[in-house]
């Protein structure tokens, strides 16, 4: 049996982060870190060896989730799935300029989250070096 997929969760709303982390654990994933800012997301993604990063787009502070994802992708081949309640045209364009592994709208629908994670993980495993 494969070990559970390791996830870095990036969410700046504490209650939402706890809820999503709980849902991920119930689905059998291992949440290795919860980041609340872009710089923290980068640090955890590069030091906690996640299989995937679940990234809220709208974060407090100067760096949003798209900028954080760019930094992560420039340093490591880790798939990033974006999460957001609202994405305007400019943000959509910025997302498309990254190698997004998926998008999950808020409020999070658990089957959609699980299916998106599975697609991202299977695609990443087929691309990663052996």
Annotate each predicted stretch with a short phrase.
Residues 37, 63-67:
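Acidic catalytic/metal-coordinating carboxylates
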Residues 90, 108-119, 125:
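C-terminal output helix
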Residues 43, 66-78:
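Short amphipathic alpha-helix used as the core "switch/output" element in two-component signaling
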Residues 13-33:
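Two-component/phosphorelay signaling modules centered on CheY-like receiver
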Residues 56-57, 84:
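Active-site residues of response regulator receiver
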Residues 81, 87-105, 115:
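Alpha4 helix (beta4-alpha4-beta5 surface) of REC/receiver domains from two-component response regulators
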Residues 3-4, 49-51, 74-81:
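His-Asp phosphorelay/catalytic-motif detector in bacterial-type signaling
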């Amino acid at each position: 049996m494969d070990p559970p997929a390791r996830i870095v969760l990036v969410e700046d709303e504490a209650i939402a982060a706890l809820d999503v982390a709980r849902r991920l654990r119930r689905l059998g994933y291992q949440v290795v870190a919860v980041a609340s800012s872009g710089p923290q997301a980068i640090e955890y993604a590069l030091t906690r060896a996640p299989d995937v990063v679940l990234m809220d787009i709208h974060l407090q502070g100067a760096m949003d989730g798209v900028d954080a994802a760019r930094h992560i992708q420039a340093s490591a081949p880790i798939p990033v799935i974006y999460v957001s309640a609202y994405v305007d045209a400019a943000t959509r364009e910025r997302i498309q300029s990254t190698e997004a592994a998926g998008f999950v709208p808020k409020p999070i629908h658990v089957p959609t989250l699980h299916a998106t994670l599975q697609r991202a993980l299977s695609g990443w495993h087929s691309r990663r070096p052996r």
